[in-house]
Amino acid sequence: PAIGVTCTNPSVTAGNTHYFRICFLDPFQGTVLANYATEKLGATIAYCLGELGNDYDTGLIYNFKQAFEKNGGMVVDEYFQTGNTDFTSYLTNASMYGAQVIFAPCSLAYAALICSAAGAQGVTTPILGSDTWDSNVVVDAAAGQNITIYVSTFYQEGGSPEFDAGFKAWINSDSVHLANNNGNDMISAVSAMGYDAYMVALEALKAAGSKDPKAVNAALWDVKYDGVTGAIAFDETGDAIRDVAFIKHLDTANSAWELAAVQGKD
C-alpha cells in the first residue's frame, strides 16, 4: 500500500484499493478558499490564474469557481504557458477586470514569480494560494513587499508544541537539514503531514502484526490516529476524513505565517 501526504487531486485514489492519503481534496480546498474570499474578504469578483494543461491548477480553479459563483460572485480565469516567467500582463488583467481577489493555485516556482511581480507592480489585491504556496520559498519571495497573501494549508506551526520543538531541534542539529529547509527552522505543513503519514503507516503495521503488504493494506482501512495535523481516519475510497483547512496570512514585514482562520466548506 501507499500513503499520499499532500496529493489533493480526487483522481489519486479513485478505483485504487491500495492507495490512501491523509490530506483534504481539491473540491474541499477550492470551496474553502472561495468561501473565505466571499465571507472574510468580501470579494465579489475573482481573477483565477493557473498553468495551462496542469490538472492541479485546472481542477482547483474549477472547484473555486463553482463555489465562488454559488456565493453570488463573478470569476474571470486565465492560463499561462508552461515556463512563463513574466506575470506582469496577467496581474494587469486582474486589475482591469476589477478583481477583488486573485486566486493562483500554481506551483512554487510560479508562486515566487507572481509574488515578485505583484510587489513590483504595487498590487494590493489579496492573493490566494493553495497548499502548494505554504512554503519558505513564498515567504522569501514576498519578504518586505507590500502585498497580501493568504494560503490554505494542512497545519499551522503551534498546533502541536511537542512536534514543533522536536522538528526544530532536528532541523538545527545538522547544517544539511537546515539548508534543505531553506536555511531556517520554519515548519511547513508538508513536514507535519509527512510525520503523520509515517505514524499512520506504523499504526497499520502494528495493527496487522505483520510486514506482509496485504495484511498492512487491510489494516489501513481501520486505522484511526490522532496526529499533529488532526484526527485521521479513512473513508471507503482511502481518502482522509477532513472537515476544516487552516487559512494562513503572510506577514511580509516579519517573514512569518500567521493563522487567519480555521475554515470549513459550509
State each model region's role.
Residues 1, 5, 36-40, 52, ...:
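Structured segments of extracytoplasmic/periplasmic soluble domains
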Residues 175-192, 200-256:
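Segments of small-molecule ligand-sensing domains
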Residues 8, 29-33, 56, 60-67, ...:
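Stable alpha-helical elements in mature extracytoplasmic
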